[in-house]
Design a protein with these regions (language model features):
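N-terminal secretory signal peptides that target proteins for export/translocation
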Residues: 1-12
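Sec-dependent signal peptide recognition
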Residues: 13-20
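N-terminal Sec signal peptide cleavage junction
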Residues: 28-31
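N-terminal low-complexity, Pro/Thr/Ser-rich intrinsically disordered segments
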Residues: 39-87
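Cell-envelope/ECM-targeting effectors and their regulatory/trafficking segments
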Residues: 49-68, 92, 132, 188-192, ...
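Short, well-ordered surface patches within globular domains
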Residues: 79-192, 229, 235, 239
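A well-ordered secondary-structure block
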Residues: 157-267
Length: 268
């Protein structure tokens, strides 16, 4: 009797723990849709700002509809050495540098809803991106930006763009990745001019739009120290050079090289 009673007690206790655990899992699973609800794709602030093929003017107009001070942020608008996508790269940087929290609530929260496990599926884009970390890196970015302070804007540099273009050509011709080659970042930049205080470089591969390229670097999937994100949000970088082109390993979109500096003076 006692043994049977003990077994019955253990069964009831284990069943209670099972139902409590199941309830906890259901509650946690429900958290994500409550926080990151599917966006209304008819509104101006949805993924449409990230659509492929937008001119600088079209991108700026869609951002204006989302309440951004585009005249202030679109610092590359008159840079005739940049094409529209390269101008959009600078504008996309300035969005998140100017108001990280707004960027998170408008765009990162939206991108989170496009993850299915570790696959990222952007509406209207056939290519499916397979990530290593899945949605967790994007959710981390969201909360990180809520705690991030605004920093100064970036302004285009023709000479830094030359350095970026040189490196993009180098890696594309060889079908390789990374920041090495031609002596490294410092040597490449110093062939063109003199930099002050700090320099940095980011590379985005195979992005379907400039907006997506910056978002991809901010999410920084499988980069443990989130170095791309840190550079984009770094205080004290004022100048940026951008180069866009095709990379043979990423034929479904454009690749971008970005060179940053506190200040830069070209050689005479």
């Amino acid at each position: 009797m006692t043994i049977k009673a003990d077994k019955r007690y253990l069964f009831i206790r284990e069943a209670a723990w099972f139902f409590l655990l199941a309830f906890f899992i259901i509650q946690c699973t429900a958290c994500s849709p409550l926080l990151f609800q599917k966006v209304n794709t008819e509104s101006a602030s949805t993924a449409r700002v990230g659509d492929p093929g937008l001119s600088n003017e079209e991108y700026a107009m869609r951002l204006l509809a989302d309440g951004w001070p585009v005249d202030t942020l679109n610092t590359g608008v008159n840079a005739d050495f940049l094409d529209d996508d390269e101008k959009n790269i600078i504008l996309a940087h300035n969005l998140v540098r100017y108001d990280p929290e707004k960027y998170a609530r408008l765009y990162v929260a939206e991108y989170i809803t496009y993850f299915m496990d570790k696959e990222f599926r952007y509406p209207g884009v056939e290519t499916i991106m397979l990530t290593r970390e899945g949605v967790s890196a994007a959710e981390e970015l969201y909360f990180d930006l809520l705690r991030t302070r605004a920093v100064n804007l970036l302004y285009p540099s023709e000479d830094l763009s030359k350095a970026a273009r040189s490196h993009l050509r180098y890696i594309s011709q060889r079908g390789i990745r990374g920041h090495g080659g031609q002596g490294g970042l410092r040597a490449r930049i110093e062939r063109i001019g003199i930099w002050e205080e700090r320099i940095a470089e980011n590379i985005a591969y195979g992005s379907f739009s400039a907006h997506d390229a910056v978002m991809y670097m901010l999410i920084d999937d499988q980069v443990i120290n989130r170095s791309h994100r840190k550079i984009i949000l770094q205080h004290g970088l004022h100048k940026v050079g951008v180069a866009k082109g095709m990379h043979p390993a990423y034929p479904t979109g454009y690749s971008y090289v970005m060179n940053y500096a506190y200040d830069f003076t070209p050689h005479d």
